[in-house]
Design a protein with these regions (language model features):
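Walker A/P-loop
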Residues: 37-57
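Conserved helicase motor "Helicase C" RecA-like lobe of SF1/SF2 P-loop NTPases
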Residues: 534-558
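Signature of the SF2 helicase/ATPase Hel1-core->accessory helical subdomain module
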Residues: 55, 61, 81, 85-89, ...
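A contiguous, basic/glycine-rich beta-loop/short-helix subdomain that forms a polymer-engagement track
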Residues: 177-211, 226-228, 337-502, 508-516, ...
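Conserved RecA-like P-loop NTPase helicase motor core
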Residues: 499-509, 560-664
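A substrate-engagement module of RecA-like helicase motors
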Residues: 2-14, 67-211, 303, 336-342, ...
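Conserved RecA-like ASCE P-loop NTPase motor core of nucleic-acid helicases/translocases
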Residues: 69-78, 454-456, 527-534, 657-659
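Conserved pre-motif I regulatory segment
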Residues: 1-43
Length: 699
């Protein structure tokens, strides 16, 4: 298979007008061997390697010679589109003479990513917003949401694929919920009047016949969390942008309790009550009100007794005593409502597809609410039950999927719980969230235990080693790895400059010295700067300070859509673009528009981030270094991604300037630098500014 793959790679590269790349050939060979010998593989492939071809060609060779497709999972929409709209069509054409059959490929996303024609047709209000939710929104929210829903209804009649990611203009999650359903809320294609036109069913049918199925990490997570198959049967998975896998899986497994969602659910349940039966949802509404009032009271009381003024905000290592009974009552009310609605015969709504769908949706939502309450209660007493009937039922409410729920819960293990008072139009939104401490066991058994998995990214070897990423995925240290390198000569094309003379970054914003340093660098570069900041406030403050002292246009994240800002930056060869996390990863601006990447500080996780805090403590308890395993690795990954924005083509040259002396003065600084591209390293500002002036003069 290996020699055949190299032949196919050569054919494809020649057809696409490219040139042979040693790193690409090395990666393609390793991927082919891993698929053939059925072992996992982690590959770091820097910018310019051509990693998508390096894994697609072995995947195509394996899939067209097998009855099973290869699943390719990505973190971002941009990469999914690149694969489906550019790479795979071109490869299908280039390789057609050498393949045993024409290549078939498809994209598959979760059902909730597609508009539901049945839900659109059965909208019950003028605003298009569900009645139960409509009554809880203030006029401005209702107006904005209603306008978006109206636009979605119009789009539903025009779209060819119903895919949310292909909307001409994005909408809020609240608006999208009015026109979509989850897989468990769907009444099924055979019972739905729009079954034959269903966008999700069409996408699933195309995927069932494909050799290569492109999906996202979220759907891959769902496929791992439930026993019912979501993706076509497969035995090989390619995970691109694998550095984001842990976070995406964690996000899917995170749940929350919010007063609004509980109240909406109770109203939805009440609307399903049939004549002569108790009103479903009454007890849930009362329990939700008691829980909300208790939470507000506990928050106010604890805040007044807390000299820091934060009270119960942040991580809970146990449920506050005054909240345990209200939370248990909410759990039991959710279960009772679930039983009430489940007890309504499906035949009751045989001629009403909208209510049939709503019945399933309420059953699913009450089950999830019950499970969330159980997770929060159990997180503070791992290994203990409270003896209640509902506790024994946790994860076993849905009958035909009980085993999957229990197994997934066991694999996710210990949970982390935290409370936030999110700001809202009508005052604070009191939200309690719960997330898994680790997803390693889930990945080990449900992903790696069932498939051959190839994981790849430009950033996997943190501190120069794969050890950290392997541990986060639940893979052993001896898992085969490969650093395919990059065709770019980082040392001769790029400079890493640390402004050691600046004061350490503090909480009071940018120092005068750091603003002056940034201005001198930007002026030397002639603009052409991508500013990566640790927070929105830091980006805004630096932009405000610099706009009075540099003669170049400074574009700021939040002042326009991200795509518009990046396009303006790309076209204007003297502009600067400042922003936060959205710019650290995925921004691709080759050429003369970018010669300076400015980083304000090492992007450690917030010290009050409950999940990161819990993971650090867990690492310490295992005898490791929580700071290095969690905080330093988090920072190293982002620093590597951020620095990787500089060299995007073989002709690019420039400077990565870090305004944080700790990258040089602290012990962990060397570890983070080893995670970054191998640029020439200096502490001399005059040398760097001279290099930037020469680049500006030659552009």
């Amino acid at each position: 298979m290996t020699s055949n793959v190299l032949d196919l790679l050569s054919l494809a590269v020649a057809d696409l007008g490219g040139a042979p790349r040693p790193g690409q050939q090395k990666m393609a060979t390793a991927v082919a061997e891993a698929i053939k010998k059925e072992h996992h593989l982690a590959v770091q492939a820097g910018t310019g390697t051509g990693k998508s071809l390096a894994y697609l060609i072995p995947s195509i060779a394996a899939a067209t010679d097998s009855e099973y497709p290869v699943i390719v999972s990505t973190a971002t929409i941009a990469l999914q589109r690149q694969l489906v709209e550019r790479d795979l069509p071109r490869l299908a054409k280039a390789l057609e003479p050498e393949l045993p059959r024409p290549l078939e490929f498809a994209i598959q996303k979760g059902r909730g990513n597609y508009v539901c024609l049945n839900k659109v047709a059965n909208a019950q209000t003028d605003s298009g917003v569900d009645e139960a939710e409509e009554s809880l929104l203030d006029p401005s929210q209702l107006s904005a949401t209603g306008a978006q829903v109206a636009r979605l209804h119009e789009w539903a009649g025009e779209t060819e694929d119903g895919d949310r990611d292909n909307l001409p203009q994005g909408v809020s999650d609240r608006a999208w919920r009015q026109v979509s359903v989850s897989s468990r809320e769907c009444v099924g294609a055979t019972r739905c009047p729009f079954g034959e036109q269903c966008f999700a069913e069409r996408a699933r049918a195309r995927a069932a016949d494909a050799d290569v199925v492109v999906t996202n990490h979220a759907l891959l997570a769902i496929d791992a969390l439930v026993d019912a198959p979501v993706l076509p049967e497969h035995n090989t998975v390619i995970v691109d942008e694998a550095h984001e896998l842990e976070d995406r899986i964690t996000s899917v497994a995170t749940a929350e309790l919010s007063p609004t969602s509980i109240a909406v659910l109770a109203k939805r349940a009440a609307k399903l009550t049939v004549s002569g039966a108790d009103v479903a949802g009454d007890e849930l509404a009362e329990a939700g009100d008691r829980w909300t009032e208790a939470l507000k009271a506990e928050a106010a009381a604890s805040r007044s007794n807390d000299r820091f003024g934060t009270g119960i905000e942040g991580r809970w290592t146990s449920v506050p005593e005054g909240l345990q009974l209200p939370l248990a009552a909410l759990r039991d009310a959710a279960w009772k409502t679930n039983r009430q609605v489940s007890g309504i015969p499906a035949s009751e709504f045989a001629n009403d597809s909208q209510k049939a769908s709503e019945r399933l949706a309420v059953i699913v939502a009450t089950e999830e609410l019950n499970d969330t309450c159980v997770r929060i209660l159990n997180a503070s007493r791992v290994g203990e039950g409270d003896g209640s009937e509902a506790d024994e039922r946790s994860g076993n409410n849905s009958g035909n999927n009980s085993g999957a729920s229990e197994d997934a819960a066991d694999l996710l293990g210990e949970d982390v719980v935290w409370y936030t008072a999110d700001s809202g139009v009508r005052g604070p939104k009191h939200v309690v969230r719960v997330a898994p401490l680790s997803v390693a066991d889930l990945l080990r058994q449900r992903l790696f235990g069932r498939n051959t998995v190839i994981l790849t990214s430009a950033t996997l070897a943190l501190g120069g080693k794969f050890t950290s990423m392997l541990a986060r995925w639940g893979l052993p240290k001896n898992t085969p790895t490969l650093d395919a390198g990059t065709p770019f000569d980082a040392r001769s094309h790029g400079i890493l400059y640390v402004a050691r003379h600046l004061p350490p970054p503090g909480r009071d914003g940018a120092s005068d010295e750091s603003v002056d340093e940034a201005a001198r660098l930007i002026n030397a570069a002639g603009g052409r700067t991508l500013g990566l900041f640790s927070s929105r406030r830091a980006a805004e403050e630096m932009a405000e300070n610099l706009r009075t002292v540099v003669p170049y246009d400074i574009l700021l994240q939040g002042e326009d859509s991200m795509s518009t800002l990046v396009e303006k930056f790309r076209k204007d060869q003297s502009a600067c673009l400042f922003g936060t996390l959205g710019l650290w990863q995925g921004v691709d601006v080759p050429g003369p528009s970018l010669s300076l990447v400015l980083i304000d500080r090492i992007p450690f996780p917030r010290p009050d981030d409950p999940l990161q805090q819990a993971r650090q403590e867990a690492a310490d308890q295992r005898g490791g270094s929580g700071f290095m395993e969690v905080a330093a690795n988090h920072a190293a990954l982002l620093m590597a991604q951020g620095a990787g924005r500089l060299l995007r083509s073989v002709d690019d040259r420039g400077v990565v300037a870090v305004l944080d002396q700790r990258l040089e003065t602290k012990r962990y600084g060397a570890y983070i630098r080893r995670s970054m591209p191998d640029f020439w390293y200096t502490l001399k500002g005059d040398t760097v500014r001279g290099a930037l002036r020469r680049l500006a003069a030659g552009s």
